[in-house]
């Protein structure tokens, strides 16, 4: 690949809590080749969990699957309000409502309430009173297999709840 064949865009943004970087490389030949290898454009819009996976995946693995999805396409944001109270927001974004509805069903089987909203994309939110149950479900036996940044927000939130109870 020669430098002249590429269209490269770079972007860096500064946010209150850090930086975000984005690098995009555009080349028609590269896109065609990736497509030939099975990487399809806009896969998020066509992503489904097929019936075979739903039927054959052992129940104890679904928490790991959902945690991986949260780590990849979700958020766990921690804020402190004007009364110095910690507020945790947890959710997942997707172009596929089906996958979020499936997660909602799976969590409901574990007595965890969630909501699916439609905006420009679909988003999935955990009900505030079930945040602790949700995280216990996700992290109960994950060992080191977690995105530490999101897990840390949860532990800070739970610690703040414990302090407010005492």
Model-identified regions with their sequence ranges:
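Internal intein/HINT superfamily modules and their associated LAGLIDADG
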Residues: 1-166
């Amino acid at each position: 690949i020669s430098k002249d064949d590429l269209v490269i865009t770079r972007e860096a943004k500064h946010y209150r809590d850090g930086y975000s970087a984005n690098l995009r490389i555009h080349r028609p030949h590269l896109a065609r080749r990736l497509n030939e290898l099975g990487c399809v454009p806009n896969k998020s819009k066509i992503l489904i969990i097929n019936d075979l996976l739903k039927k054959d995946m052992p129940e104890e693995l679904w928490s790991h699957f959902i945690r991986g999805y949260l780590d990849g396409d979700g958020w766990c944001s921690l804020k402190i309000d004007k009364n110095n109270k910690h507020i945790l927001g947890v959710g997942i974004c997707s172009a596929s409502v089906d996958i979020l509805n499936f997660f909602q069903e799976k969590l409901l089987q574990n007595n965890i309430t969630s909501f699916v909203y439609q905006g420009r994309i679909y988003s999935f939110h955990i009900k505030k009173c079930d945040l602790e149950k949700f995280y216990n479900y996700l992290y109960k036996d994950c060992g080191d297999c977690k995105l530490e940044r999101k897990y840390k927000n949860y532990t800070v939130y739970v610690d703040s709840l414990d302090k407010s109870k005492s």
